[in-house]
């Protein structure tokens, strides 16, 4: 299964995160399938490759909770009520 998740880059005390499509069995710093965006939490900037993100989501990739929030904030995803993998759903 493929996930869209954050991969830490940058230097000490100055983290920048790449948004990558990666196999769930890979480590955080493991080899990614494709880089699809960049998130800078200090400057609060986000750069997204929207066609690539939609390509992976259409083929079943699940964004993590943080990436899902970033995509909603950027307007790429709508709040559809579909649970993200790793979240608790009460019935």
From Swiss-Prot:
Q: Per the record, what is one GO cellular component?
A: chloroplast
Keyword Flavoprotein set for record: no
Among Pfam families, the record links this protein to: Ribosomal_S16
Q: Does the keyword Ribonucleoprotein apply?
A: yes
Q: Which Gene3D superfamilies match?
A: 3.30.1320.10
Compartment(s) where it occurs, according to its Swiss-Prot or TrEMBL record: Plastid, Chloroplast
NCBIfam families from the UniProt entry: S16 (TIGR00002)
What family does the entry list? Belongs to the bacterial ribosomal protein bS16 family.
Q: What is this protein called?
A: Small ribosomal subunit protein bS16c
Organism name: Pelargonium hortorum
């Amino acid at each position: 299964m493929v996930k869209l998740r954050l991969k830490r880059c940058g230097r000490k005390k100055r983290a920048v995160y790449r948004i990558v499509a990666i196999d769930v069995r890979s480590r955080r710093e493991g080899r990614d399938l494709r880089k699809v965006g960049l998130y800078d939490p200090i400057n609060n900037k986000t750069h997204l490759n929207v066609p690539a993100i939609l390509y992976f989501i259409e083929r079943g990739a699940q964004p993590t909770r943080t990436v899902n929030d970033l995509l909603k904030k950027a307007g790429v995803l709508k709040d559809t009520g579909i649970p993200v993998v790793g979240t608790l759903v009460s019935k």
